[in-house]
């Protein structure tokens, strides 16, 4: 599965380079999303409203990984919209 970051999500991902424990958590969640996008750690939950079709997983108490899976196998992509803060539109 291909992993695609939005520009904002990539900047947020780079922020975690200074916090190794959180970076390891983010990397683990991303890897898990590629295998089992809708179950697993981080309390995966579908989002509603303007973010319908996207899912979130908890990174820390205040930070979320927001993502969606697009395409069909073998051409699926994991699109990451954000990996810091709470849900932004």
Please report, for each region that a protein language model flagged, where it lies by residue:
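Enriched for short, Lys/Arg-rich terminal
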Residues: 2, 8-11, 15, 21-23, ...
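Residues that recognize and position ribonucleotide moieties
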Residues: 2-3, 40
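Amphipathic alpha-helical recognition patches that constitute DNA-binding helices
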Residues: 4, 25, 46
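PIN-domain endoribonuclease scaffold, especially VapC-family toxins
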Residues: 23-30
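Low-complexity, intrinsically disordered short segments enriched for Gly/Pro and polybasic residues
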Residues: 28, 38, 66-68
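A short, surface-exposed loop/turn module that caps and links secondary-structure elements
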Residues: 31-56
């Amino acid at each position: 599965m291909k992993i695609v970051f939005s520009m904002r999500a990539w900047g947020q991902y780079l922020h975690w380079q200074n916090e190794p424990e959180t970076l390891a958590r983010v990397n683990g969640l991303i890897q898990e999303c590629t295998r089992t996008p809708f179950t697993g750690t981080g309390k995966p939950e579908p989002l509603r409203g303007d973010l319908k079709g996207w899912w979130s997983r908890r990174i820390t108490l205040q930070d979320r990984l927001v993502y969606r899976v697009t395409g069909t196998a073998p051409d699926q992509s994991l699109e990451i919209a954000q990996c810091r803060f709470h849900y932004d539109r």
